[in-house]
């Protein structure tokens, strides 16, 4: 990734509800309001549900950037300091709570990613074996395609994979409209 400066860490990680959030939301909704998830760090803070402590090591792509180490236990305090990092990017280290160790098991992680991140627009990789595995999610799901570009077999495969049903659906309706609101999806009718 492009990493963050200390100021960006303060703004986007430390201050979830920074003073301009309401103004930003209002402007964002006027501009279409798509993709608001991920803009306030709420997803990041949900990591504290299973972690007792989280560290961020980051270095911005900007010229003369220095590394930043941020750490917090999720309460009201945190530490932030410079650190030595050779490359730009961000690494997040979650120290999993003792009673949440099941979330360190490959099968559990894989299952959660496939269930909750199946159609994220960015590829998600899980590397337990030391080699590059294929992405666990589909960054271009079938419902984003134009109906004319989809085959019957693709519709059936997507249904079986998404709904874990080995039967073919009875029929389906591919929704792709822009007015009076934007809607893309596939409505399946099981047998």
PLM feature segments, named:
Residues 1-98, 102-103, 111:
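GHKL (Bergerat-fold) ATPase N-terminal catalytic module, capturing the glycine-rich phosphate-binding loop
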Residues 36, 54-77, 97-100, 107-191:
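GHKL/Bergerat-fold ATPase module in large chromosome/replication-associated machines
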């Amino acid at each position: 990734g492009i990493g963050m400066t200390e100021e960006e860490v303060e703004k986007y990680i430390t201050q979830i509800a920074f003073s301009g959030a309401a103004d930003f939301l209002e402007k964002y909704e006027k501009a279409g309001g798509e993709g608001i998830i991920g803009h306030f760090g709420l997803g990041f803070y949900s990591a504290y549900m299973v972690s007792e402590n989280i560290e961020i090591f980051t270095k911005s792509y900007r010229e003369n950037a220095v590394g930043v180490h941020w750490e917090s236990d999720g309460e009201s305090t945190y530490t932030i300091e410079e650190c030595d990092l050779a490359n730009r990017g961000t690494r997040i280290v979650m120290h999993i709570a003792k009673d949440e160790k099941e979330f360190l098991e490959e099968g559990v992680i894989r299952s959660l990613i496939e269930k909750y991140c199946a159609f994220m627009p960015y590829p998600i990789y899980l590397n337990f074996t030391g080699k590059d595995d294929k992405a666990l999610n589909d960054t271009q799901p079938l419902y984003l395609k134009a109906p004319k570009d989809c085959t019957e077999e693709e519709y059936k495969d997507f249904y079986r994979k998404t709904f874990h049903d080995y039967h073919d659906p009875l029929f389906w309706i591919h929704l792709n409209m822009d007015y009076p609101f934007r809607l893309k999806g596939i409505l399946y009718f099981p047998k």
